[in-house]
């Protein structure tokens, strides 16, 4: 299915950085997995299926992942003009949304924006200024998820003398050059 193919594409392209603490290993994916899944599920659930020849797109760049869904908000509003904490749930395709809910891909109504933003803010590698961006017009709906690991391509190994463990220290590419 398009959903499973899309989730596979996201998973294959979602690299992980990690750091080791004295007790555990902390994985830090480029994109919070639940946030990316939520974007794809919502793009499929709320797209305008009457736009023949158009489809949901997932485009991955070095610094971001962009989701495009045909058709703007069903209400005609522009998401960038709204308070994301108070956007009412209006489903363009209630049957599709119901099926996705029964398959445990969708949660309660109207929780998508909040879930995506919370997943970013709770990520171990969260940085201010990398908040997800939502944009819509009458033609489509776009979500931009920023790569939380962009610029952290170099890992230097340092040895901690006091306990003999090795810990990965993440260094931005800009710091090395």
Question: What are these model-derived regions, one by one?
Answer:
Residues 1-177:
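C-terminal regulatory or interaction extensions
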């Amino acid at each position: 299915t398009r959903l499973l193919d899309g989730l596979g594409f996201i998973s294959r392209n979602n690299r992980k950085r990690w750091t080791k603490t004295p007790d555990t290993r902390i994985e830090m994916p480029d994109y919070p997995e639940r946030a990316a899944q939520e974007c794809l599920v919502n793009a499929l659930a709320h797209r305008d299926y009457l736009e023949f020849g158009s489809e949901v797109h997932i485009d991955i760049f070095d610094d971001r992942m962009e989701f495009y869904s045909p058709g703007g908000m069903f209400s005609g509003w522009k998401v960038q003009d709204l308070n994301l904490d108070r956007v009412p749930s209006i489903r363009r395709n209630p049957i599709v949304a119901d099926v996705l809910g029964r398959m445990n891909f969708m949660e309660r109504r109207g929780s998508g924006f909040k879930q995506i933003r919370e997943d970013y803010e709770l990520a171990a590698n969260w940085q201010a200024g990398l908040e997800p961006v939502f944009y819509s017009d009458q033609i489509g709906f776009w979500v931009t998820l920023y790569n939380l690991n962009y610029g952290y391509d170099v890992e230097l190994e340092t040895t901690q003398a006091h306990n003999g463990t090795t810990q990965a220290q993440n260094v931005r590419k800009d710091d090395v050059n």
